[in-house]
Amino acid sequence: SKVQYGIYSQGESRSNKNQGTVIQLNNIDLTSTANTAVAGVYLGFENNAQISGNTIKNISNSTKTVAGIALGLLPSLNMNVFNGNDVANSVISLNTIRDIARIGDGSAFGITMAAVIAGGSSTNELSNNMLFNINSTAATTMDYIAGILVGGGAVGTTKVLYNTIKLAG
């Protein structure tokens, strides 16, 4: 199959975010012989979202950067800008994310989170997730591989707690 996202949810704007989205207990397997997947779950402009108990696996692409869960930040080859469609006051927990691969040179991430840049105080929590086999098959010094990538920002707090990360298989 040729699908880019297992689950995609996008609010209208920073001032009109989706409220209370729940993504729970899904099995997202984007196995594709064409290597066309980008992310298992993508959320943008969300408030009070919960992503928990999901199994996300076999995300691969030969032309784009890939992620298991992307929160307001669609990964790019050059990860030096962390602003995006921010997700606020949300909990991402108890997910298993595995076999995320950029085929060839490029970047791959287990979980990405954009910086929260406006809207007052916000607390996001990434906890008790298990991430493994996150890789690029021909990474160069310009490529970026990370289990969890969190963009910094002046507004809000991000708690990264009790996750298990093993980049290799």
Protein language model annotation of sequence segments:
Residues K2-S15, T33-F45, S62-G84, I103-I117, ...:
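Extracellular beta-strand/beta-solenoid scaffold signature
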